[in-house]
């Protein structure tokens, strides 16, 4: 059973498999905001769950993530009225060239996008 006070669920990387499980098996989660951080969007199962059970999700992914596919991402965004934060040159761990300062700047960008998403209707 999912706590009724939960409004947002987040999955990161392999956690997006758990997120898809929640959405498939617990109908009450389908009204919650979902944040898919470095989702495994090359997985057809993940794509299917996002399309059928995730309303207006936020997807966060880097262009150097091996799971990044611009066509798949665009299809998901169109199918769900979702939003995305795509980080140029970021890998699956959100690491970017430029050392620690660049990484901190990426984390700030992501937190700002997540905050805006959480505050949105």
Regions found by a protein language model. Name each.
Residues 34, 84-86:
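Conserved beta-strand scaffold positions in the cores of enzyme catalytic domains, especially
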Residues 39, 62-63, 89:
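Cofactor-binding loop segments of dinucleotide-utilizing enzymes, especially the Rossmann-like FAD-
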Residues 109, 113-121:
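C-terminal alpha-helix
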């Amino acid at each position: 059973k999912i706590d009724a006070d939960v409004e947002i669920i987040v999955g990161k990387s392999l956690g997006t498999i758990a997120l898809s499980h929640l959405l498939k098996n617990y109908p009450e989660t389908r009204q919650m905001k979902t944040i898919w951080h470095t989702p495994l969007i090359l997985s057809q199962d993940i794509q299917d769950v996002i399309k059928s059970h995730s309303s207006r999700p936020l997807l966060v992914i880097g262009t150097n993530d091996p799971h990044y596919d611009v066509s798949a991402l665009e299809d998901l965004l169109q199918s769900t009225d979702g939003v995305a934060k795509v980080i140029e040159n970021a890998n699956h761990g959100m690491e970017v060239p430029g050392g620690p300062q660049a990484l901190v700047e990426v984390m700030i960008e992501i937190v700002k996008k997540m905050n805006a998403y959480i505050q949105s209707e």
